[in-house]
């Protein structure tokens, strides 16, 4: 990493404002100030240790005293913490300040646990490479997690210099906009500097940079930081995929103001308790559902279904409804792992629909007979 974007080794008390310190955090920290503890923000986490920027500089801190049973409460990049004042290496994190927002995905395990990727985030920057075919369903998945986190999402289409002409770029932006209502979609070229100033002007506060490996996140981060801070690896021409360039989550200061959390490429983007986020991504379907004749309409074959009517008249693309159903089912399955009542209700619905299907088949056989 370049030293120009790393925290200063000895920032002043007021310089914590660069990292997002404000009156709200000061009020949260007041109960610790009397014990001589120091406020600081976690800029990097490594297996039980973390780097924390404080008024005294960047200190190495052990998280031994704040190891929770709940994986959602582990110390994460972006957290504000209270650390020991003693000058020793490492110091200890004594407490974690309540988070304002948190970006969470489900883990690949069957234990229904969430993995927190970044804390206290204002903007979720979703990087999507134009060097590969657009996967609108994956973009919608990222957006659901972003909205659920409480952050404002921004979709950044990277490697726009590889698109043959401006008309094609505009068409691709338009396609993504259909999957991202209420979200700004920008096409940028970090190599040529196109669109970087516009993006930088949007990113006040704390932003987290997300995307698959090969999406150009590290190159984009370097362009925003104005320095070669993040290492960049080559991408395979055959599929546009790359290796993990970033292996840890790092919090870095942007020259335009605010801070950026760069994350490793995400192969899996599982939903975690993201019902509200899914609803936000598919706000037009949620609005149509309010006009259905029945309040519990499943949008399958019910009479008076406004969603199906929109499908029939072409105002709602079938792909959008399919994606909406898929993400809702996934979110329900995850929720059912930990909610016995929901699990029983889902079984009841499945049995009822199975019985209805069998009855329909029997009736059909009777008519044919």
Predicted segments, located by residue:
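Histidine-anchored nucleotide/phosphate-binding helix
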Residues: 137-152
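Short, Lys/Arg- and Gly-enriched loop/turn segments at beta-strand edges
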Residues: 88-97, 135
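Walker A/P-loop
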Residues: 218-219, 223
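Canonical P-loop GTPase G-domain recognition
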Residues: 152, 162-215
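Short aromatic-glycine-enriched beta-strand elements
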Residues: 48-52
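Helix-rich effector regions associated with P-loop NTPase G domains
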Residues: 2-19, 33-36, 70-87, 97-123, ...
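Beta-strand/loop nucleic-acid-binding surfaces
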Residues: 58-75
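Structural detector for short beta-strands of small beta-barrel domains
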Residues: 35-46
């Amino acid at each position: 990493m370049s030293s120009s974007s790393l925290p200063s080794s000895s920032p002043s008390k007021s310089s914590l404002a660069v990292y997002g310190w404000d009156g709200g955090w000061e009020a949260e920290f007041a109960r610790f100030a009397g014990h001589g503890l120091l406020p600081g923000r976690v800029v990097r986490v490594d297996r039980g240790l973390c780097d924390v920027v404080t008024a005294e500089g960047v200190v190495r801190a052990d998280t031994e005293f704040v190891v929770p049973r709940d994986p959602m409460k582990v110390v994460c990049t972006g957290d504000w913490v209270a650390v020991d004042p003693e000058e020793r290496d490492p110091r200890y994190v004594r407490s974690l300040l309540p988070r304002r927002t948190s970006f969470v995905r489900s883990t690949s395990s069957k234990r229904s646990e969430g993995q927190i990727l970044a804390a206290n985030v204002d903007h979720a920057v979703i990087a999507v490479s134009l060097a590969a075919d657009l996967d609108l369903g994956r973009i919608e998945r990222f957006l659901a997690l972003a909205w659920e986190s409480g952050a404002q999402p921004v979709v950044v289409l990277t490697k726009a210099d590889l698109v043959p002409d401006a008309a094609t770029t505009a068409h691709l932006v338009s396609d993504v906009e259909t999957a991202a209502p209420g979200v700004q979609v920008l096409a940028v070229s970090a190599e040529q500097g196109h669109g970087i100033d516009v993006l930088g002007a949007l990113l006040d506060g704390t932003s987290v940079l997300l995307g698959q490996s090969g999406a150009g996140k590290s190159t984009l981060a370097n362009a925003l930081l104005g320095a070669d801070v993040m290492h960049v690896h080559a991408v395979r021409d055959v599929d546009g995929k790359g290796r993990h360039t970033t292996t840890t989550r790092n919090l870095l200061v942007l020259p335009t103001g605010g801070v950026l959390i760069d994350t490793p490429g995400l192969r899996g983007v599982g939903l975690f308790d993201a019902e509200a986020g899914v609803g936000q991504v598919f706000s037009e379907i949620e609005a149509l559902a309010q006009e259905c004749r029945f309040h519990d309409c499943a949008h399958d074959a019910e009479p008076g279904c406004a969603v199906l009517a929109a499908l029939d008249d072409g105002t709602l693309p079938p792909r959008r409804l399919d994606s909406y159903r898929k993400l809702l089912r996934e979110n329900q399955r995850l929720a059912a792992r930990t909610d016995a009542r929901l699990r029983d209700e889902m079984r009841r619905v499945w049995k009822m629909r199975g019985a209805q299907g069998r009855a329909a088949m029997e009736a059909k056989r009777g008519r044919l007979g």
